[in-house]
């Protein structure tokens, strides 16, 4: 049974700095909205590589973004060593910049926390909370650079970027 606004599943393969990143996106918007969003994600990825000088080594040889932007989705985001999963009830056409902010934040974690992290976070316990007095520092750097990357990539103006702090 089809419902109003039933989405078409879309996937695009993009390349940033000759390094493949696969985007899978589930939304109920247009192909033009998807292409704009994927292009902006590519700008974020490219700017992050500029900050760190290179891509980290991905065990799978690529990085995958999986996003679910539907009215029925809950808002959440989580990075992993080789991928990021994002969800939001916001549509690409109305929440574009906010959704990109989550992408930028989570992708910065590819370096900061996934590969550079306080010792108190190790070893990871995937069955319980990992309390750490230093996590605020890792998240603080990620919040700062996530917003700065959007501005450097031309996706947010300086006034709005400074207002976030």
Residue ranges and their predicted role:
Residues 8-11, 116-124, 129-165:
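Acidic/His/Gly-enriched intrinsically disordered linker/tail segments
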Residues 1-9:
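Extended, low-hydrophobicity, Ser/Thr/Pro/Gly-biased non-transmembrane segments
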Residues 11-134:
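Juxtacatalytic substrate-recognition/specificity segment
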